[in-house]
Amino acid sequence: MLTSPLVVTYNISLAIVTNDVFFPIDIRDFREVLAKNGYQIEPLTKSLPPRPAHFQASGYFARKNEFVVNIETINNQLGLEGSSSERIVEAFNELIDIVEKQIQVNLKSNVKFYESIGSYGIQATESAIKQFGLLTNMIIFNQKIENILSIPTQLFGLKFCPKNAMPNQIEWFNIDVYPDVLQPNKFACNVVFRSKEKDKVDKWVSQDKELIKNIIEVMKLE
């Protein structure tokens, strides 16, 4: 009987990127409104210029509970980062709602895409490296590579993406699964999921650990 693998979220982010020429939120207003809504605001490294001058910001901007607000004004990106797949969608929706209702900026009206980036750890029942070497559908391929290199060879990881798609497309995902370099009985997994449709990204985030677990279970059977 196969033991269902335990999937742990190490880090996950959820962000919106807009098509605006300039970042659509005034940083001064954003700091004030977030503070009123219980966010801890990161101190500025330089003073804010007088209005209406545009202010560039990058990286850690504020924090509330377990999530950090990240901002990239050059890329028109606003997002959250933390370690809870289960709660990040709700926290992200709260952040967007604050922007729309209290700053009167409708980010969704000019959205370019939404994106989630996650890193995960998965406990293996035996050596993760060994399990890649046992993938029967890859044995012939591995043998051909061995013949080229004249060195015993096996897979060290797998990467999945949409069929016939390229990474510079808006509708995109990639899932990397590979042995944890420091813990041989664990898999590591990195995921990027991007779409113009928020529902698609939210659905992925809500199911991420279950889907990753299913991928690992399929590998056990191959």
Residue map of PLM features:
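Short beta-strand-to-loop capping motifs
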Residues: 14-21, 80-84, 121-124, 191-196
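Short, conserved charged micro-motifs
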Residues: 17-28, 88-91, 126-132, 199-205
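Short amphipathic beta-strand starts and helix->beta connectors
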Residues: 63-67, 99-103, 171-174
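Aromatic- and glycine-enriched beta-alpha-beta binding-site module
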Residues: 71-113
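N-terminal low-complexity, intrinsically disordered segments
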Residues: 1-71
